[in-house]
Amino acid sequence: LIDATVDAEAVVERSRVQGSHIGRAANIGPWTYMRPGNELGEETKAGAFVEMKKAHIGNGTKVPHLSYVGDADLGEHTNIGGGTITANYDGVHKHHTTIGSNVHVGAGNLFVAPVTVGDGSVVRHDVPSDSMVYSENTQHVVEGWKPEWER
């Protein structure tokens, strides 16, 4: 720990945390690298081989393993799958990624900043290799799409 604050009940296991704040009951590590400027909320997780820089992580959000989250805001109760990267640098400028609350991101994703993923978002169709997903079509809202037991 270097110039870091760790709140009560938080656990930091075999990790480097520098210039960051770790919220109550957060779980960090093992082998997490937190560069300066991170703010992790309560009951968050930054797991094995996760690197973070200037990330703001909402309460209950999990980044369990093998991910880079830099210059990003993640909402509350969001889950980031392994191998997810927020690509924040275009060779000249740093850009920001925002991922909302209650978002479930699968494994192996690349978010090329600047980009925003809204609350509760899901990509529901296959995406071919070497493709980019974006939408300029009419948005369809499916209210109550989660099963009752999951709400």
Question: Where do the language-model regions lie?
Answer:
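Glycine-rich hexapeptide-repeat left-handed beta-helix
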Residues: D3-T5, V12-R151
